């Protein structure tokens, strides 16, 4: 029986309607359809148009119906077209025509027989069309609907493949799909469209376009995919509805994906696949899996959700989005991406065979579950580096962002203003040549930023990095860390920690480091620190603004402030022990205990304008250290304390001590103090050895006045014009040169005790 359809514009309803009449009786039925569906049936101009078509009605039957002729076909409401032969199809069409089928609401095509198929359709030019408003069902390996040579499926009803696919031990892929395209095609679903099966849509080859506004629900025991693109495929996937896959073989091993692009038999994918999501994509394993191809583009729009994982499954490695290969892949997330797993779980993963590309996040990317290696964004790569731009939020139990450039040219992370990355380690670098720019927040329970590699560049500009360690370099050389104005690094232990290597730390004016134990800690290697901002250590015991441990060397240049606020034993603005460290200070160093504490072989240059203040401003606790002071050194008890031998102090600035300006402790030998023009000393100069054998000596050079009492030194040698106005001067030297006037005039206004004095010719005492 034939039926004639008219598509007309109904002004009262504001929509197109389909009217039909039986060719034999003239009776008419009205079926309303959306304008978008009407457009699919008829190419329309801007104004409403009227078209007529006559369809051949396929009657209810239990044998295969073979299409013939060019007239469109319809399965009417109430009709069921099926086959009682399990391996055959209910409707078949060869390649003599492009077939056009309409399945009305309430109509059924296919059966529940094992391995049955609803439609097996070839096509003359690839223009075969199936519009389903009813139910299409099957259980065949080659799909409920098989499109052999292109074509389109429009689904406003229900399409299902009821087969149960068990785990194939030989990993042979199966095609238990609702729609199976051998050579490209398209699938379009309205909000009412439902597609269910082990897989939803499988594209074997060619160009395909999938637009889902309804539901694709794939539920198999293993290898279940919402949309699968295979060998040589390319095209687009647009989802405004829901794509869900769940699959488990019962042993904890699962392999399912909402979107899966890959290749079979090592065939190359000839093109690219783009994914555009503003709906929901969900999977137990990998939600969007792009495994073979190049130049992929994925957009998750505002309101879009891509999520992976299942808390009821143990030992699962879940990933919301994984791109294993591809050059210059682009991922943009404005919505929500999340993954749950107990091992190696990722929000977005760029695999080892990717090169270049950009990840842009303005939404949220989250992983939970606490598995080792978890990351919101994990980038490998083996070619050009990948760029990650974040102005949204990223959070994870392990890593927020992990950049692995062991095989690539180095990646780039731009954490922009207003953004936030949080995890046990907010950002981790493994490899060389990576670039990190932070204007937002990086918050780590352990590390805000972890670096393992060489020649990485880190710049924080107006942002904040925090953690137990703000920034930690576990190994590597040539790394450059710069904190610009407005930046803040906060830590419950150490602001910047460097384990080894030769690296550079620069903090500019307006930046701040606030930490409990160490503002900056250098454990070994030749590392340089330039501070123009503020460094503050707040701990109550053994806290340091900058600490160089044994084996560490380098140069500290301070034009800013370095402060400790606790009153614990051993606190110091700068603490250097081990290798040779040169300290150049023209800023401010302030501590309640020690300003600068050094052990052996270090150099302190307190330049003009430089200020060092503490209970003991400068402590030499070792040998062969050098102090040159042109600024101000002020100690509540001692300005400078020397405990060691072979140290030199050269002063043309100000040294103040509540008790001693300069104190040489007992057992310290062969130390030399030189006071030059411009010297201001307040407090005593004391050598606790009080022994000539200690051989600690004072040299007066240039001109000036010294009002300090002097006691215990081996000798005083004057080479210039000096006035000693202190109350006493007691020297321990046993020769006539205990007091030696080599040139100029030396005036003594106090009492002197010495074994002898030498006044050279032409000089005055």
Ranges and model annotations:
Residues 661-670, 686-759:
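Extracellular repeat-rich scaffold modules on cell surfaces
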Residues 43-61, 718, 727:
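Extended, small-residue-rich solenoid/repeat segments and analogous flexible loops
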Residues 8-51:
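Gram-negative bacterial Sec-dependent N-terminal signal peptides
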Residues 1-6:
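Short acidic, Pro/Gly- and aromatic-enriched capping/linker segments at domain boundaries
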Residues 52-58, 71-88, 102-116, 128-143, ...:
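Beta-strand-rich solenoid/repeat architectures in extracellular/passenger domains
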Residues 62-68, 86-95, 114-123, 141-148, ...:
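Glycine-rich beta-solenoid repeat tracts in large extracellular/virion proteins
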